[in-house]
Regions:
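Membrane-interface transmembrane helices that cradle and orient dolichyl/undecaprenyl
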Residues: 143-157, 189-193
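Perimembrane helix-loop-helix junctions
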Residues: 178-194
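Transmembrane signal-anchor helices characteristic of membrane glycosylation enzymes that use polyprenol
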Residues: 10-40
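Membrane-interface micro-motifs in multi-pass membrane enzymes
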Residues: 58, 62, 86, 107-151, ...
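Extracytoplasmic catalytic/substrate-binding loops of multi-pass membrane glycan-assembly enzymes
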Residues: 28-48, 56-68
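Short hydrophobic/aromatic helix or loop-helix immediately within or flanking a transmembrane segment
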Residues: 55-80, 84-89
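Short, Lys/Arg-rich, polar N-terminal cytosolic tail immediately upstream
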Residues: 1-11
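Central hydrophobic cores of alpha-helical transmembrane segments in multi-pass inner-membrane proteins
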Residues: 66, 87-99, 118-121
């Protein structure tokens, strides 16, 4: 059995819980927008990213968005698929937060999932910029993964740098997710050593 399979078997229950909690919160909070073609704002001009989207994203400094689109979803804006990808990335992020901070309570884990899914950036993007929702949530997952690697492995900050660069290449303000989680980790370390 490989290292990845062993890790999965050890954490299978929490992986399923994280994804179930994210999916339930996500459908309750944003199901209508994800299952409806109500395009607004940039979603109209980026319905087909080949027309305006890729060049515009690169000019804004979001240099990895075209690569992300080609790898994961293509150029068309399909709200249901974008919604599923977004929930997938947030599910991974929630699981990594649970492992980073060693959360063992289902109640706390469910609340963490609710915070990730219902926070204002997710809500506003779902309502107005659904064309960017999945790639931005991929950036959030990269930001969380960087903190997870930094906290769990002695040299984890090295690959963590690549994940921070990935988050910055998707959307620059996602760096705040990394900064916030690092601050929480530092505060918890200080409190543990009092």
């Amino acid at each position: 059995m490989t290292w990845l399979q062993e890790t999965y078997e050890r954490n299978k229950r929490w992986v399923y819980f994280a994804f179930a909690a994210v999916f339930i919160w996500g459908m309750a909070a944003h199901g209508y927008a994800m299952l409806d073609n109500s395009f607004t704002h940039d979603s109209l001009s980026e319905f087909d990213a080949n027309i305006f989207g890729d060049g515009h994203k690169i000019m804004l400094g979001r240099i990895l968005v075209p690569t992300y689109r080609q790898l994961f979803r293509g150029d068309l804006t399909m709200p249901w698929f974008i919604g599923l990808l977004s929930l997938l990335w947030i599910g991974i992020a929630v699981f990594l937060v649970m492992k980073t901070f060693r959360i063992e309570s289902k109640l706390i884990a469910g609340l963490v999932a609710g915070v990730f899914v219902a926070y204002i950036s997710f809500s506003s993007m779902t309502a107005t910029y659904i064309n960017d929702l999945d790639n931005n949530m991929f950036g959030v997952m990269c930001a969380v993964c960087a903190v997870f690697l930094w906290r769990r492995f002695s040299w984890g900050w090295l690959p963590g740098i690549a994940f921070v660069i990935g988050a910055l290449g998707i959307y620059q303000s996602i760096i705040l997710v990394t900064v916030t989680l690092v601050m929480i980790a530092c505060i918890l370390d200080i409190l543990a050593n009092l």
